[in-house]
Amino acid sequence: LDCFKRVEGLIDATSVEAIHSARVLLDQFKGKSETIAQAIDDFLLDFMTLLFVVEATREQFHNPARRLARIRLSKVRLLLTRCS
């Protein structure tokens, strides 16, 4: 699951390109189950929210938003591990 290390690195990049790259990397797993697809969508939504937070708010809010995105990504990873 090297893909997850790459996506986790993208969380720190926080750009529109990073969101697109994460979507491309995670799309390969969407067909496994509806639950996994929903978890991926939840992660991507939180990642987009993180981008907004980084661009629009003070730095004190950046780390909590990054932590939330990482938690959502961990959920996707856990679901995929159970599915395999």
Question: Residue ranges of each PLM-predicted region?
Answer:
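Alpha-solenoid helical-repeat scaffolds
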Residues: L1, D12, V16, A37-D41, ...
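Short terminal alpha-helical segments
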Residues: L1-D27, L80-R82
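General structural signal for alpha-helix termini and helix-helix connectors
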Residues: G9, A13, G31, V53-Q60
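Amphipathic alpha-helical binding modules
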Residues: L51-S84
